[in-house]
Curated annotation (Swiss-Prot):
Protein name: Putative protein p16
Organism: Acyrthosiphon pisum secondary endosymbiont phage 1
């Protein structure tokens, strides 16, 4: 039993008889669609960055120069130079610590 009619899938037959949506309903659906997609986003959570530790070399004690018991005037001048150098090195360490603390305070604001 062969017929000359072309083959049609049953679902295509249903599409012919289906009611169409009114244009207003289609517009409402199009307007509601962005609202649904807007709810999908997850909030961005920023994690605090731990502060950088101060290097141990900056926290070391400043070693004073050794003072000998018998000093000459020349040895006294050398000792004064060594003391001033040790003081300058300590001041540089303290300035570096202050810069690190300022950077921490600036990043926390």
């Amino acid at each position: 039993m062969h017929t000359n009619r072309p083959y049609r899938h049953p679902s295509l037959k249903r599409l012919r008889y289906r009611k169409r949506l009114p244009p207003n309903a289609a517009l409402i659906c199009l307007c509601l669609l962005p609202l649904l997609t807007g709810c999908v986003r997850t909030p961005i959570k920023y994690l605090p960055v731990p502060p950088a530790p101060i290097p141990a070399t900056l926290l070391d004690d400043c070693a004073p120069p050794v003072i000998s018991e018998h000093m000459t005037w020349g040895d006294s001048l050398v000792l004064n130079e060594q003391l001033l150098l040790a003081l300058e090195m300590c001041n540089q360490d303290k300035a570096a610590i202050r810069r690190i603390e300022e950077q921490k305070n600036d990043s926390q604001k």
